[in-house]
Curated annotation (Swiss-Prot):
CDD domains (alphabetical): RasGEF (cd00155), REM (cd06224)
Any single GO BP term: cell migration
Protein name in UniProt: Ras-GEF domain-containing family member 1A
Gene Ontology molecular function, alphabetical: guanyl-nucleotide exchange factor activity
Record keywords: Guanine-nucleotide releasing factor
Domain Ras-GEF: 208-455
Listed PANTHER family: GUANINE NUCLEOTIDE EXCHANGE FACTOR (PTHR23113), RAS-GEF DOMAIN-CONTAINING FAMILY MEMBER 1A (PTHR23113:SF172)
Entry keyword Nuclease: no
Function, as annotated: Guanine nucleotide exchange factor (GEF) with specificity for rap2a and other Ras family proteins (in vitro). Plays a role in cell migration.
Domain N-terminal Ras-GEF: 33-164
Protein source organism: Xenopus tropicalis
InterPro entries: Ras-like_GEF, Ras-like_Gua-exchang_fac_N, Ras_GEF_dom_sf, RASGEF_cat_dom, RASGEF_cat_dom_sf
Amino acid sequence: MPQTPIFPSMLGSTCSGQVQPEMGEHCGDPVYQDGSLVSGSLEVLIERLVPTLDYYPDKTYIFTFLLSARIFIHPYEILAKVGQMCIKQKQQLESGSEADKAKLKSFAAKIIQLLREWTETFPFDFQDERARKEMKEIAQRITQCDEENGTIKKSISQMTQNVLVVLSTRGQFQEVREKIRQPVSDKGTILKTKPQSAQKDILSVCSDPLILAQQLTTIELERLGNIFPEDLMQIISHMDSLDNHKCRSDVTKTYNLEAYDNWFNCLSMLVATEICKVVKKKQRTRVMEFFIDVARECFNIGNFNSMMAIISGMNLSPVARLKKTWSKVKTAKFDVLEHHMDPSSNFCNYRTALQGATQRSQSANSSREKIVIPVFNLFIKDIFFLHKIHSNRLPNGHINFKKFWEISRQIHDFLTWKQVECPYEKDKKIQTYLLTTPIYTEEALFLASFENEGPDNHMEKDSWKTLRSTLLNRA
């Protein structure tokens, strides 16, 4: 029977998520379509995960199954079933001929390889003590196959140590993230008077659009590095009801996704703050044109997320209403950027640009050309859409593996992008400003905007009066 394909594009426009089986419709046998695995019972899919003397699962199958199976069963339960199957095979070899016994070491090496791939790709499955216990039990059985020189025991020890290091690193990141997260909600500055022109601003920290775009890219890549496949599958977990979701304790663990989403929002608000807090129109115009140039450099780099955040910030109402300032801005470059991010036809222009950046990355010789940072919000929506329109199970009870091939393909692309080594050195001064400088609340932005360019209609005048009254009474 054929092996699983390398992430085929399997969900065409005519696909409804319902598989027309070629075989195994009324049993647990896996179903293939055009040589590709499209469905099967959970038990059969787990069996395909377990190596034998003559078989080792394709890497893409391992990734897709371990990624998607958590929708139906806890990772530690999969480990338990894998362990049972391994022990059964081991016992069969031990009770066989001398030739079979000689193959024990080879069999054990394959099991270790599977565990290594699992721990490297989904290390946070092993945050669960039950998963660590199951892995330990498998390891104890397998080490018996090579007691003479202890090679397998050493491999297991190193693998376990690597997992603990990764878990520890993530724990440290979480502690740091929690410490800097709280002040973010306090960054809104309530304005009682006009901001002072001597106030520190972005141009006094960095006046080169390319350098700022590069520093934004280092921040993006650092945050992408803390997002893992398990985090992305939480999107589906949140959509499934608690009654149907097998990993209930994991449903709310989306810290890394929240942190990345918060970064996008903070960058948008920072852009708006930097523009609205400038008193002089000429300087405000310069700041606007600077951010347009930064967004363009982000586009050239392949950093679409920062580019979108900057454009979003400049399109916020407090900035968009500054008509006198915009009249002085050279908007040709901004119009081009907005064209790339035009939401019509499901962001067709952006997707074309993303595809171009992906192709450039695949043939790149330098890390600078490999950078692809998608608009994260749109990436999440794509996964949401795939999950929403295709069922998890088919009428015969099979898992709809065809659906999970496509989801895993998109997540695999994301993992490839996030693993790119950042080619830019951190500038501590610039990054400190980007990450810690106070940003205005929406109310404060509107008030600053009105003070820079007064209300030009009755609705704006009423809003201005209400804002001033609210903010001053709050002080």
